Amino acid sequence: MTLTSAFCATDSTAASSAPDLSHAGSPGGVCAIHQPNLFPRLSTLAKLYAAGRWIVLDDVQFARRDYQHRARLAALDSPARQQWLTLPTHLPYGRTTLISRARLADPSRSRRTVSLLIRQYYGRSRHWPAVRGVLDAVLDQFETTDRVSGIARASTITLLTALGWSGEVLDSSTIPTREGRSERLADLAVATSSTHYLCGTGGWRYLDPAPFDAHGIPVLAFHTPVETEDPLWRWSRGISSLWALSQIGPEVLAAMLAAQRDQLLLGGFT
């Protein structure tokens, strides 16, 4: 199995653009497979940004302790001061409910909460226009869906798009796969003609490389810096990436993530 570690660099550029929830991409390239997260953490966003294709893992069991329906907001000037932004969720099939079938318990109330809390936390940022663009695009989704996965998916795509990402987004529920955990991930990569699989630190703990090796698909290990003085990375595993966007804006944040992605690709494709 091919293993590459990705670290952060600081000297790259990337363009920003207005949020757009529709994406199309060409076959091949690097894929990341991850559950939909509400306003994801920077560590998650960085992994998805580094991939050319995000396969949304929407047909696994919903977990209330995970991030599908909640995000941890950090105060603009004091990231240690945090608050959960949570979407009350109804599980029609109890604990066995899949992420794709989880529903908003009160869509109107959730929409108001999202709007008020994000404005409260980041409305004073000089980069508020960029944050507001992300927020407005997500608020619009409450008018079209009551599915938690739909809101979480939209929040992630909108953040990625604000940073200039223009990859492909697919749902795992539309792709037939085998039952085994690693077999399933490998089948998703094969079915989408992906040439490499980008695996985060969480997935690496259980991943069996054999199903990927059988198809000649290298696995790239992705992680963000741990021993660093940069507050953006020190807080990247715990709080929503909205804080980073509010701190440095879309252009600088995109450049930072692009540098990390480029270093990964240079190491992984040699």
Task: Walk through the language-model features, giving the residues of each.
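Residues lining hydrophobic/aromatic ligand-binding pockets adjacent to catalytic sites
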Residues: T2-T270
